[in-house]
Amino acid sequence: MAGLSRILLSCTLACLLAGQAAQASVDDPTRAGGDNRVRALRADQARRDVLLTACRDDPGHRRGEPDCVNAERAQALQQWQAAAMTSVDAAFSDLAGALRNAAPRRMEAAIVRLTRQLQPLVYSMMTLLVLLTGYALLARRDRPFEWHIRHALLVAVVTSLALSPDRYLSTVVAGVQDVAGWLSGPWTAPDGAAGRGGLAQLDQFAAQAQAWVAQLAGQAANDANPGSAVNWLLCAMIVAASAGGWLCLAASLLIVPGLIVTLLLSLGPLFLVLLLFPALQRWTNAWLGALVRALVFMALGTPAVGLLSDVLAGALPAGLPQRFATDPLRSTMLAATLCATATLMLLTLVPLASSVNAGLRRRLWPNAAHPGLAQAHRQAAARQYAPRPAAAAAAAGPHQAGTYAASATPAPAPARPAPSFPAHAYRQYALGGARRPPPRVRRDDRPAPAPDRRVLPRKPNLP
């Protein structure tokens, strides 16, 4: 277990350092025009070929330069767009290229976002986790790593509230402002740059889908043939349903986890106060579990939506509105298939996040059905006031004693209420009585012997 603690601790610290490095690289103003350069290289094939040739001739020195990276991304997106109407093998190969070029950037942006929003809590938790793990290794305490994570999370929240409440409040206010900006303000900047990350791409796609539906509906309204008008209208409904499903699911995965995290952090002090009352500690455990689940959905949903938005933008042909006018059915099925595929890929993220949450709940809270000290005290009190096995066997009869005492029906426990004041619960917990498992009685499955009902001869009455 000590080796697992070291491995997980090293991985967590590496992720934090990667997040800080990624944040520094994202804040660089030269990186803001990366998408514009990719679009320019995607349109200028001659310049893209020159850059790709130069990068392939000297891969050791120029492979990691921004021009080479942008050229490779533009080449992957161009190949995927060209293969949208070709064979399945070429489409899947170019899809793999697009994923390979877009996935690192999306994961990097997700790490930066989580590091920015939860920086005070994360660094307090990591400091305490290092201290607890070091103490466990030095003192040779055999404690599971989940115990360190659970206690470090609680102590980090309490410490951040006690020592720097202004930073905790600023974290909550920043989350509220972010959600309010998503719901009210424009998702794209006036100059066309991406102002809200993945939501800017969703806004652009929503504008494109609205134009497609308007074009198809206009064709249906202007067509004098009723049969053709119905076909145009069906195409418009198919495009609206597929694009609307993708937009609703992607926007919900981007907005709802952040909203839930902000709400839970704002209610954090209230749930931490409940730790003082043993009967209400299960509410604090439920709050921590909900916070972890929301963070998992935020960490998985944001890069997935951004990655699929990039792939969908590269897969849709550039002249799709003109194709709607010439070949409406085939163009409609192409757009609907791409949107439905992206929606199904997002839907597969839900069971993945649920399985991750279930694993975290089993590892971090192995006794999830155990609400706290109150139930532990009640279990200890029930064992304390339960009748002893000898008394139960004596009350059951002569043939139920000995080996067959466990199969007897025990006598009902006396109706004496267990003490419920907190001092007794803490004393029971401190003395170890609440954590002691109940005594296991050896059970014998053999039936009880039948009583001897033979008639014995009476003894003669001798004088």
UniProtKB/Swiss-Prot annotation:
It holds the Pfam family TrbL. It comes from the Bacteria. Keywords: Cell membrane, Membrane, Signal, Transmembrane, Transmembrane helix, Transport. Residues 376-463 are annotated as: Disordered. It comes from Bordetella pertussis (strain Tohama I / ATCC BAA-589 / NCTC 13251). GO terms for biological process: protein secretion by the type IV secretion system. Residues 411-420 have a biased composition (Pro residues). Residues 1-24 form the signal peptide. The keyword Membrane applies. This is Type IV secretion system protein PtlD. Coiled coil: none annotated. InterPro entries: Conjugal_tfr_TrbL/VirB6. It is a multi-pass membrane protein. GO terms for cellular component: plasma membrane. Residues 376-410 have a biased composition (Low complexity). The chain crosses the membrane at residues 118-138, 232-252, 253-273, 294-314, 333-353. It is found in: Cell membrane. Residues 441-455 have a biased composition (Basic and acidic residues). Induction: Cotranscribed with ptxABCDE. Activated by the two-component regulatory system BvgS/BvgA. Component of the type IV secretion system ptl required for secretion of assembled pertussis toxin (PTX) through the outer membrane.
